[in-house]
Every structure is written in C-alpha cells, then in structure tokens.
C-alpha cells in the first residue's frame, strides 16, 4: 500500500513539474497551488491548533517547534 502511494505521488509530482497546461484556468491555478504547496517551503505549525510557529514560544504548552510543534525527548531550545 505504501509503495502504491509513493508511486502515485511520484507520478503526480512528475506531471506537475512538466508544466503541462490545461485549457481550464481553474484547473491550471489548482495544479499550480498544489505544486507550490507540495514543493514550497514547509511552514511550521502547531500540531494541536494548526497555527504557524516560528519559535518554541509559539507552540502549545511544553511542545517544541521542530517542523511542527511536537513533544521532544530533549528540552526545547
């Protein structure tokens, strides 16, 4: 199942990266937005409230900002 999902994701990314244009502007905007979301810089978010975090003080409770707000073994910076 994981292999199938990985293959589908790779094919979708390959299709999006070829710059294939569609005649429908909405579809073109949707694929551009999806490509930007998949390949763009990843925003750090709180896992509970899904709010963006840029540092540990933006996180919920004792969570650390490490890609998302998450519980870590080592203390936060």
From Swiss-Prot:
Residues 21-45 form a propeptide. Expressed by the venom duct. Residues 1-20 form the signal peptide. GO terms for cellular component: extracellular region. It is found in: Secreted. InterPro entries: Conotoxin-I_CS (IPR013141). It comes from the Eukaryota. Keywords: Cleavage on pair of basic residues, Disulfide bond, Ion channel impairing toxin, Knottin, Secreted, Signal, Toxin. Disulfide bonds join 46-60, 53-65, 59-69, 64-76. GO terms for molecular function: ion channel regulator activity; toxin activity. May embed in the membrane and bind to the voltage sensor domain of a ion channel. Does not induce paralysis when injected in fish, leading to the hypothesis that it may be part of the sedative nirvana cabal. Belongs to the conotoxin I3 superfamily. The cysteine framework is XI (C-C-CC-CC-C-C). The presence of a 'disulfide through disulfide knot' structurally defines this protein as a knottin. This is Conotoxin G11.1.
